[in-house]
């Protein structure tokens, strides 16, 4: 039997020597008897989380429950449930004894309790972030209870982890079991591993092992109680020590209190369904939740709604926790722009948010999106990029400009819109110094020679000024050629310049 279970967990049955991940430092907290480690992939160095559970006896009940947790996490997929990557079980010599250890590898996450200490939020910002997190965990619980007819069994602060984008994920599936409503008369345990749950987290029917009552209750009854425990721990700032402490509601926000009390109703059949909490809770009606929700369904919004939203977003972002804006909103915004669901006003917001990042982080989190956007066919996007190029142009490498950016920017030299031609011309003050001699001589000068006879007098004049400004970046042959053109140009229009200000 153990051999079968081990194969279920390990897949190929590989030992730790073949483990494709490096186990790193340990977090201070984790759910149950598990240990939560930082880790990295041996293939590409990408970060992961590694959870380990050890025992001297492979048949130890904690190990058996741990294998249930592995199986459940592997098979249950949802955006608000921790993403499973890999698992294995290894036997390692620990002195004269053999230690059996189960390893689960997941997306990189951090215990919620530790992330909250790190963020150190207060007041409205804290409540808005808690609302977003609770909204996510409620969706995970609703999915398990209502869609899958599964019971998690121990929803609490320790069973929640936080991703690098500050999203909350539900995990700790060792207790998770099917909701066995078709066997109401049975007195046998429905949750095989309920002994793992601390007594302070158990509703009355579970603490009494009243399985008949549990089977007659809705599938969300136990986990709704758990959501109440999570809410208490979040706002009190302390781990739940006794069930009686749940009656202390002094720290619970008034807008959440009615829902909190319904989640913890002493009658299981009257407890609030998590789906109703998601749909109706007043506590979830705040700027952060509404902003993220809007951005996640951006492709369903019409142009007017998008434009209105993005014109308001800079002011909203100023009021939200800076780390949440940079780690959650900015990646969603960048992705929306890349896939075409966001329009030009969103680019202005992206650049504003990006200005709050250190230079190295801007190059990692914002610049790749900007480079991709230069290939856009949206004229408004192209115009916005050119208009703001002074904000990011210096951050682009010469190779990126020469190979990825200039070929797309160059189409603007022959655009039918004079404004685009003018912006393209002015962008060369930033881009030309990063171009190769081959590109300058073979492409740029040809485009500029055409602009010298442009129908717009301002463009003709600015082209001549630009040639003088970039001559120092050319080789001797090209520079001499430009100088001859520069001194021989006669144009009666003289009020334009590359900065857009009159002479």
Cite the ranges covered by each PLM segment.
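ATP-binding glycine-rich loop module of kinase domains
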Residues: 24-75
